[in-house]
From Swiss-Prot:
Family, similarity comment: Belongs to the asfivirus B169L family.
Keyword Flavoprotein: no
Glycosylation sites: N88
Protein name: Transmembrane protein B169L
Main location group: host cell
Length: 162
């Protein structure tokens, strides 16, 4: 019976911890900063009881407000810095995974294909050679020349190879 009672308490604790509002409240950095500030203020007032004198009471209140503002800025800076690091790491993971997806593994890099206008400009700059003899109309192209590859096969070779 005692073991069942302890197991029930542990199960209840797990249910409370996994409850959505409780879980997200401790993931919110602003709420964490407020909790830490409240704990520091409680400790501050427990150690230093404010004096009864009115002038000293005002000075103590000013010091308390300065401490509150300083702690909030400190928590904001530290938590914002940590969140920025997490955000930058997650962005780098997204960038790296998109590069791997683009090149399908990252090892094989597909060279960019130059547009046809660039190759035409290069050919126009060179002087054209005119053959010396007459060319028969039924002549076949030389065996050295390669046949043209369809453009789709150049862009997406993986679809045609499979």
């Amino acid at each position: 019976m005692n073991v069942d009672f302890i197991a029930g308490i542990n199960n209840l604790g797990e249910k409370i911890y996994t409850c959505e509002p409780f879980k997200t409240s401790f993931q919110n950095p602003f709420i964490v900063a407020l909790i830490i500030t409240a704990v520091v203020l409680v400790i501050f007032f427990a150690i230093c009881n404010p004096p009864v004198d009115k002038k000293r009471k005002t000075k103590t209140a000013i010091y308390v407000y300065i401490c509150i503002v300083a702690l909030l800025f400190l928590h904001y800076y530290v938590l914002n810095h940590q969140l920025n690091e997490i955000y930058n790491k997650s962005n780098m993971d997204v960038i790296v995974s998109s590069i791997h997806d683009k090149y399908k593994g990252g090892d094989e890099i597909i060279p960019p294909i130059s547009p046809p206008s660039v190759s035409n400009e290069l050919e126009e700059d060179q002087p054209k050679k005119i053959p010396a003899g007459p060319k028969p109309a039924d002549s076949k192209p030389a065996a050295d020349s390669k046949s043209l590859v369809p453009l789709q096969e150049v862009i997406m070779p993986s679809q045609y190879n499979n």
